[in-house]
Swiss-Prot record:
Gene3D superfamilies per record: Transcription elongation factor, GreA/GreB, C-terminal domain, Transcription elongation factor, GreA/GreB, N-terminal domain
Name listed for the protein in its UniProt record: Transcription elongation factor GreA
Function per UniProt: Necessary for efficient RNA polymerase transcription elongation past template-encoded arresting sites. The arresting sites in DNA have the property of trapping a certain fraction of elongating RNA polymerases that pass through, resulting in locked ternary complexes. Cleavage of the nascent transcript by cleavage factors such as GreA or GreB allows the resumption of elongation from the new 3'terminus. GreA releases sequences of 2 to 3 nucleotides.
GO BP terms in the entry: regulation of DNA-templated transcription elongation
SUPFAM superfamilies given in the database record: FKBP-like, GreA transcript cleavage protein, N-terminal domain
Sections of the chain in a coiled coil: 47-73
Signal peptide, first to last residue: none
Taxonomic placement: Bacteria, Pseudomonadati, Nitrospirota, Thermodesulfovibrionia, Thermodesulfovibrionales
GO-annotated molecular function: DNA binding; RNA polymerase binding
Domain of life: Bacteria
UniProt entry tagged with the keyword Transcription: yes
PROSITE patterns: GREAB_1, GREAB_2
One Pfam family linked to the record: GreA_GreB_N
Amino acid sequence: MTDRIPMTPEGYEKLKEELDRLIKIERPAIIKAIAEARAHGDLSENAEYHAAREKQSFIEGRIQELQAKLARAYVIDPSKINQNKVAFGAKVRVIDIDTEEEKEFHLVGPDEADVKNGKISITSPVGKALIGKEVGEQVTIKAPAKTFNYEIISISFE
């Protein structure tokens, strides 16, 4: 898979920190735990050994996943983007035309999306609808349960 992954500087650093923690702290700790469990004798009935090996497998898989994501990542600096239009990295404040409720969305790459914290993927229906729009423009987003009508009230890049 050679697709490049757009990422904010913050998202890239977060993945890098997790990778460093796994390599420098978690991996050595699990190797030590396996060695200690191995010292307890018969491995066929050694629950500690099997649990440690399972955890090691998970850690190694996550390390490979993070290395692949970071290798494909390209960091987009929001300060170098046209600030007048919604683009990757933008924080967009909208008002729901029907309910007059204000919401804020932070447009990020798919690997950084966290809906509970207002971070939505640029590939999501909301992200796709907002990209390229300007303050004052209205967008309609058709979700499975409901249609949302938003007006963009501000765009910022931090």
